């Protein structure tokens, strides 16, 4: 699972997901990509599940780039705990994804294989996505 090696602070504010992504919205490494169409928090488990699904589908050959990284800690309070007594402890990590952000890129495979692999990865994501081709 992806997570930062160290962070400056253990806990973060939840924040808001306004607007569209101005960074990370162009294909940089591969030829095909999966682009987000909705805002969401994507957990490190979901990112890993999508990556595994893609790599299993293409087997050998081709290359996969993961363009998002979970760098936001999500805190969870223990169940049946009374209000107060501070914020909960960090439980898992998420990547904040806005519309337009590229999630995965793929290269070195024919388009039909890439389309199939990326559609399997998109089914692992909690948001609507689209398949795009560079050029």
Curated annotation (Swiss-Prot):
A biological process term (GO) from this entry: mitochondrial translation
Pfam families: Ribosomal_L16
Protein name in the entry: Large ribosomal subunit protein uL16c
Entry keyword Ribonucleoprotein: yes
HAMAP family recorded: Ribosomal_uL16
Keyword set, alphabetical order: Chloroplast, Plastid, Ribonucleoprotein, Ribosomal protein
GO MF annotations in UniProt: rRNA binding; structural constituent of ribosome
One cellular component (GO) term of this entry: mitochondrial large ribosomal subunit
Subcellular location: Plastid, Chloroplast
Cross-referenced NCBIfam families: rplP_bact (TIGR01164)
Record note on quaternary structure: Part of the 50S ribosomal subunit.
Taxonomic superkingdom: Eukaryota
Similarity annotation: Belongs to the universal ribosomal protein uL16 family.
